[in-house]
Amino acid sequence: RLAVIKRIVEQDFGLQLIDLGTKGGGTYSIRDLMYREIEASDIFIADLTSNRHNVMVEVGYAIKNVGLERMLLYFEPMEGVEKPPFDLNGFRYEQIADSNDIEIKVKPKLKDILDGVAVGEL
């Protein structure tokens, strides 16, 4: 899923994707880096699949700092996990069946957000 999102963001839209999941901690606090990266983001994309706790923290921080209107959430149901966690299930997210659905369902939503930002609506 990440490879498809990365291609869409970087190749199709010419933007920089910052993947918080692959940032190394080094000699600094990864949380501090995560918070700075989210605060500096114009758009926030999150994969809610697998209900990873760190992603839930990132989504919460992005809601406060980026705003729901500039966020794109997607979720792929897996065995035993049919919906995102209850506290995110009420938010707008795109349900995908596999990585191919990212191109079909997620890319147009990302374009809508970018268009809204470009004209100052978001």
Q: How would you label these PLM feature ranges?
A:
Residues G14-L15, Y93, V119:
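Short aromatic/hydrophobic-glycine micro-motifs
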Residues K23-G24, T49-N51:
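Short, acidic/glycine-rich phosphate-metal binding loop used to engage nucleotide
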Residues S50-G116:
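Cross-kingdom TIR/SEFIR domain
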Residues S41-D42, I63:
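Short, hydrophobic, well-ordered secondary-structure elements
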Residues R1-S41:
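Conserved N-terminal substructure of TIR/SEFIR domains
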Residues R7, Q11, L110-L122:
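Defense-system signaling and execution modules centered on TIR/cGAS-STING-like, death/scaffold domains
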